Amino acid sequence: MFSPRRLSAEELRDSMLFVSGELNLSIGGIPCHPEINDEVAMQPRHIMGSVGPAYQADPIPSQRNRRTLYAERIRTLADPMLETFNKPGPDTSCERRENATIAPQAFTMLNSPIIRARALALAARLE
């Protein structure tokens, strides 16, 4: 038997995709670009002294809905949903993760368009 435990940020995203039937379980290959908050995606990124292009999620759902393990990590562009659920930063090594329960986690689960899309996919799957 497995005892209940708190999910990490990556496990939470993967679980929502799995339950909604949208998770792509393919192994290996090129990194995916999952959808992130639009306000963060449209922020200008500075690359080598110039402004880089805005972040774009993969256009095909099966590409962007791969496991979080395969998501490309851009150091200057953090995924706010995963950051809210204590994903470690890209700048330092992480021996141990923090387990903080904070109000923004509940607000993210209630108000995020990405999570709302997973809930709609689950509802459509159950019909």
What are these regions (language model features)?
Residues 1-127:
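An acidic, gly/pro-interrupted, aromatic-rich
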